[in-house]
UniProtKB/Swiss-Prot annotation:
One Pfam family of this chain: Trp_DMAT
High-level lineage: Eukaryota, Fungi, Dikarya, Ascomycota, Pezizomycotina
pH-dependence annotation: Optimum pH is 8.0.
Residues annotated as binding substrate: 210, 212, 279, 281, 283, 368, 435
Residues given in the record as L-tryptophan binding sites: 95-96
Domain of life, per lineage: Eukaryota
GO molecular function: transferase activity, transferring alkyl or aryl (other than methyl) groups
Name this protein carries in UniProt: O-glucose prenyltransferase PaPT
EC number(s) reported in the record: 2.5.1.-
The entry's keywords: Transferase
Pathway the protein takes part in: Mycotoxin biosynthesis
Family: Belongs to the tryptophan dimethylallyltransferase family.
Length: 453
C-alpha cells in the first residue's frame, strides 16, 4: 500500500555493497535545478543502507542487479523527496518513503518494493505560485521515470492525474480552507492533503511502476463521496473502462448494502503499464472493526465470492491471524475485534485493497495489518513474522529474519517502542498461493549516527 509521510523528515543506513553512489551520475535525467541537490544527497545516504540490507534479506539479487536498482533510486527518486530536516529531526527523521519485501509460497526469494510521496513535486516553492497542487512537477517527474525505465505506459496515469489533482483556482481556494478546518486526524495536524504517490517493484531483472491517487482532496472540494469518485474514475478509463465496470459496480453494491461496517475509501492505484495488463486497485479502511468474521465478510464480499481460491486463502489467513494481531492462538474469538494501542485513524487501522483487471469477474482482496497497533516491540513483531513465514513454507527466511533485521537496522532498540515495522499485508491467489508483504519505515534506525551527515 502506498505510504503517506506527513512531515517530510528522513531516515536509513549503511550496507555492505561496494557500489559508491555518493554523487549523482552524469546520466541523470531529472531537471537541472535538482542536480547536485544536497537534499537528495541527504535522503540517499538515509535510503541506501536500508535498501541494501533488504536486498540481502530478500535474496536472489546479483550485485549488478542491486547496483542498478540503487542507482535508479539515487538518480531518479531521491531528488523528489523534499527538503532536509534540521536540528534533532535530522538524527531521528523519517523519510517520505516506505520499503517492503514480498514473499510468496511458490517462490524461493523475496522481492523488494519502494514507494514514496514526492515532496519536492507536491510541496515545493512552486506550489505557492503557478502550480498549487504540484501537478506540473508531478508530470515532469513521471516523464523522467518513463524515460529512465522505458517499459512504462502512462495512458491511465495521465487520465487520473487530471481527475484527482486539484488545480482549478476555485477548487484550490476551497481546499486550502478545508485543510485549515476539515481534515481528519492526523492530517489535521499538518493541514496538508496528500493527492499523489508512486511505487516501484524492484524485481531482480526489472523495475515496474505503480501510481496512487488519494480522493480526499477532490471529495473536500466537490462534496462527492470518495468511493463514488474513485469508482466513477475507474469506469471512465480509456481504454477498457467498460471491462472494469462490472467489478466497480459489484464493489459499490457491497459497500453500500452488505458490508458489515463503515469503510472509508482512501486510495486508487494502477499499474503504470499497458492498460490490457494493468490492475486497478481500490484501497479502503475500517476504523470500526477488525474481527476475523468481519475480514471473512470483506474477502467474500458478503458471501458472493465463494470460489476455491477465496476459501483457501481465508483458511490460511485464519492460521496466521493470531500472529498478525499479536495474540496467543485461540485467545481471540472470530467474532471479537482486537483492541488497538491507539485510537484507529488514517493509516492506523485495518486496510483492504481490491484489485482487478478488465474482464475480471471478481477482485483479488488483500489485507493490511498495522503491526505497531498490536505489538509492543519490533522484536515481538519479528518473532510473529518469522512464525508466519514458516507457515508460508519459507523456513530459511523465517530462520534468518531477526538476524537480517538486526543487520539492516543497527540503531534500532528492538525491545523499545516499535520503530521499524509498519504493516504486514496478506493475499492469496490460485496462481501464486499465499503471500505476505512486510512494510518497513525508512528512518535513521538503519543509519549509524555519524553517517547521517
Amino acid at each position: 500500500m502506498a505510504n503517506v509521510v506527513l512531515d517530510g523528515s528522513a531516515a536509513p543506513a549503511k550496507a555492505g555493497l561496494p557500489l559508491d553512489l555518493s554523487s549523482p551520475s552524469k546520466q541523470t535525467n531529472f531537471p537541472t535545478e535538482l542536480e547536485s541537490n544536497s537534499n537528495a544527497d541527504f535522503w540517499w545516504r538515509l535510503c541506501r543502507p536500508e535498501m541494501a540490507g533488504l536486498f540481502k534479506q530478500a535474496g536472489g539479487y546479483t550485485e549488478l542487479q542491486q547496483e542498478s536498482h540503487l542507482r535508479f533510486v539515487r538518480e531518479h527518486c531521491a531528488p523528489w523527496m523534499g527538503t532536509v530536516p534540521t536540528g534533532h529531526m535530522a538524527n531521528e527523521a523519517v523519510a517520505p518513503v516506505e520499503m517492503s519485501v514480498n514473499y510468496i509460497s511458490s517462490r524461493d526469494e523475496g522481492v523488494l518494493r519502494f514507494q514514496m510521496e514526492p515532496f519536492t513535486a507536491v510541496s515545493g516553492p512552486h506550489t505557492q505560485a503557478d502550480d498549487p497542487s504540484g501537478k506540473k512537477a508531478v508530470c515532469s517527474m513521471l516523464r523522467s521515470f518513463q524515460h529512465a525505465l522505458g517499459d512504462v505506459d502512462l495512458t491511465w496515469t495521465w487520465q487520473l492525474v487530471d481527475k484527482f489533482m486539484v488545480t482549478a483556482p476555485d477548487e484550490v481556494a476551497r481546499l486550502r480552507e478545508a485543510e485549515r478546518t476539515s481534515l481528519p486526524p492526523p492530517l489535521d495536524l499538518y493541514q496538508r492533503t496528500p493527492q499523489f504517490n508512486f511505487a516501484f517493484d524492484l524485481s531482480p531483472d526489472k523495475k515496474s511502476m505503480k501510481t496512487y491517487f488519494l480522493p480526499l482532496a477532490k471529495s473536500l472540494v466537490t462534496g462527492s463521496s470518495a468511493l463514488d469518485y474513485c469508482l466513477d474514475a475507474v469506469r471512465s478509463l480509456e481504454p477498457h473502462g467498460e471491462g472494469l465496470s462490472p467489478v466497480a459496480d459489484l464493489l459499490h453494491q457491497f459497500f453500500n448494502t452488505s458490508c458489515p461496517g463503515h469503510m472509508s475509501c482512501d486510495y486508487l492505484g494502477i499499474d503504470s503499464t499497458n492498460p490490457k495488463r494493468s490492475r486497478v486497485k481500490l484501497y479502503v479502511s475500517s476504523q470500526q472493526h477488525n474481527s476475523f468474521n468481519f475480514i471473512r465478510a470483506v474477502f467474500t464480499l458478503g458471501g458472493i465470492a465463494k470460489d476455491e481460491a477465496t476459501l483457501r486463502g481465508l483458511e490460511f489467513l485464519r492460521s496466521i491471524w493470531h500472529l498478525l494481531v499479536n495474540v496467543d492462538e485461540g485467545e481471540l474469538p472470530d467474532s471479537s475485534d482486537r483492541p488497538a494501542k491507539q485510537l484507529p485513524f488514517f493509516l492506523g487501522c485495518l486496510y483492504f485493497s481490491f484489485e482487478w483487471r478488465a474482464g475480471d469477474r471478481l477482485p483479488l482482496v488483500k489485507l493490511y495489518v498495522p503491526q505497531w497497533q498490536y505489538a509492543q516491540s519490533d522484536r515481538k513483531i519479528a518473532k510473529n513474522i518469522s512464525a508466519s513465514l514458516r507457515k508460508l513454507g519459507r523456513d530459511e527466511a523465517a530462520d534468518e529474519y531477526l538476524t537480517h533485521i538486526k543487520q539492516t537496522f543497527p540503531r534500532a532498540d528492538l525491545d523499545g517502542n516499535v520503530s521499524i515495522h509498519n504493516q504486514v499485508s496478506y493475499a492469496y491467489s490460485a496462481e501464486t498461493g499465499a503471500y505476505l508483504t512486510i512494510y518497513y519505515s525508512v528512518n535513521s534506525k538503519a543509519v549509524a549516527r555519524d553517517q547521517i551527515y
